[in-house]
Design a protein with these regions (language model features):
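Conserved class I S-adenosyl-L-methionine
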Residues: 1-45
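A short beta-strand submotif of the Rossmann-like class I SAM-dependent methyltransferase core
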Residues: 116-117, 125
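A short acidic, Gly/Pro-enriched loop at the edge of an enzyme's catalytic core
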Residues: 106-114
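A short, conserved alpha-helix within the catalytic core of class I
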Residues: 123-132
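Conserved catalytic/acceptor-binding region of the Class I
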Residues: 133, 137-203
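Conserved Class I S-adenosyl-L-methionine
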Residues: 184-274
Length: 274
């Protein structure tokens, strides 16, 4: 069995149980609306039931639910799920929140669609992928969903050094999740689409809060003094980018954008075959 890259260590996933990270998580930009619609179209088998793994606060699950029959939203962080219940769509009758690790939480297959929004990299692939293969319906798909809100190259060039100086994770690896899964023969890609850019207009403080929802900048991991220094430096860089025109600013909001990528396919094997 190939070891996972250190950057994807389950140790870092534990930070998503941290109350500060949970509180900051809703500040993340939403996945593109067109991507949510496309995910619903991937669920072709009847009944149109989906499983959202590592659902966090349910940005996918809550928005997918009106478009299909049922969504089981699973996360090992009780705090994330409790937050999701209180967000729009969180009390829908066809959203079933389940607290537990995907490796062993009770499931209710078959599922016409499994979604993994920026979550699969934290899991035990050798356990989870075969389990999903068994849980998928005959024409079901696993959709791996990601989003890019880092901005154009000119903006990234200025922000990246700040991120690297202050990151609580001191592991630098260029890792591609899909390549890792395919090299282990755990996932077969059937297609990929990119959606957006969609506008994202946070204030500077909302942008900083969004950064603190990431494992590398969790306040509890950074420490109070380091977190304040990070905020001050990044706030200064954002101000300079607004003044220079590299980032358009309207009133007190940053005129940014977010793109969403959906890559779908299927883990090999499984009890249900096409």
């Amino acid at each position: 069995m190939q070891p996972k890259p250190e950057l994807y260590s389950s140790h870092y996933a534990q930070w998503f149980k941290d109350p500060d990270v949970i509180a900051a998580y809703p500040s993340r930009p939403p996945y593109a609306e067109a991507a949510i619609q496309f995910l619903s179209e991937l669920a072709t088998d009847r009944p149109r039931r989906a499983l959202d793994i590592g659902c966090g606060t349910g940005d996918i699950a809550r928005r997918l639910a009106p478009l299909i029959d049922l969504v089981d939203a699973v996360d090992f962080s009780a705090g994330m799920i409790e937050t999701g219940r209180h967000l729009p769509g969180g009390t829908a009758s066809n959203v079933r929140w389940r607290i537990g690790a995907v490796e062993d939480v009770p499931l209710d297959p078959p599922y016409a669609l499994v979604t993994a929004g920026e979550s699969l990299h934290w899991m035990n692939w050798e356990v989870v992928l075969p389990r999903l293969a068994d849980a998928l319906s005959p024409h079901g798909s696993l959709a791996i969903v990601g989003r890019d809100w880092e901005g154009p190259p000119g903006v990234r060039t200025h922000i990246r050094p700040v991120l690297m100086r202050h990151s609580a994770v001191r592991v630098w690896q260029d890792v591609d999740l899909l390549s890792e899964l395919q090299s282990r023969e755990l996932f077969t890609v059937l297609g990929s689409r990119r959606f957006g850019p969609d506008p994202w207009e946070p204030t500077v403080e909302q942008y900083l809060e969004c950064r603190h929802s990431q494992r590398s900048f969790a306040r509890s991991a950074m420490g109070e003094t380091a977190a304040r220094a990070f905020d001050a430096e990044l706030r200064q860089v954002l101000t300079e980018l607004c003044v220079s025109g590299a980032i358009q600013c309207l009133s007190d909001t940053l005129q940014l954008s977010v793109e969403t990528t959906v890559t779908w396919g299927r883990p090999p094997g499984g009890q249900n075959t096409r």
